[in-house]
Amino acid sequence: MRHYEIMFLVHPDQSEQVPGMVERYEGIITKHNGKIHRKEDLGRRQLAYSINKVHKAHYILMNVECNLDALNEIKNAFKFNDAILRHLITVQKQAITTESVLMKKEKETKVA
């Protein structure tokens, strides 16, 4: 199985449905005997440019280990979900379990 980093942007009007979406995608991965190494809800953030006249989106980041069947099923789910504005799936050489830079910055600003 290969390691992947999955980032997807959810329409801000659908923010309350994000936990259900993440649960569904986790279910797809575990159904195919995959593993989730990191899952981060980065919250609602400003977009660099508007997508379909939307200026903010809810960001979700996941690092997973899964086979091609699970990945294709997730891609298909993203494709047919209107709430997903954009998604990006990249191949990683190894499992990434450390906290992302965005989460570290967010925690630093909360402490300060």
Swiss-Prot record:
Pfam families: Ribosomal_S6 (PF01250). It comes from the Bacteria. HAMAP family: Ribosomal_bS6. InterPro entries: Ribosomal_bS6 (IPR000529), Ribosomal_bS6_CS (IPR020815), Ribosomal_bS6_sf (IPR035980), Ribosomal_S6_plastid/chlpt (IPR020814), Transl_elong_EF1B/ribsomal_bS6 (IPR014717). Keywords: Ribonucleoprotein, Ribosomal protein, RNA-binding, rRNA-binding. It comes from Legionella pneumophila subsp. pneumophila (strain Philadelphia 1 / ATCC 33152 / DSM 7513). GO terms for molecular function: small ribosomal subunit rRNA binding; structural constituent of ribosome. Binds together with bS18 to 16S ribosomal RNA. One of its GO terms (biological process) is translation. The lineage of its organism: Bacteria, Pseudomonadati, Pseudomonadota, Gammaproteobacteria, Legionellales. The keyword Ribosomal protein applies. This is Small ribosomal subunit protein bS6. Belongs to the bacterial ribosomal protein bS6 family. One of its GO terms (cellular component) is cytosolic small ribosomal subunit. Coiled coil: none annotated.
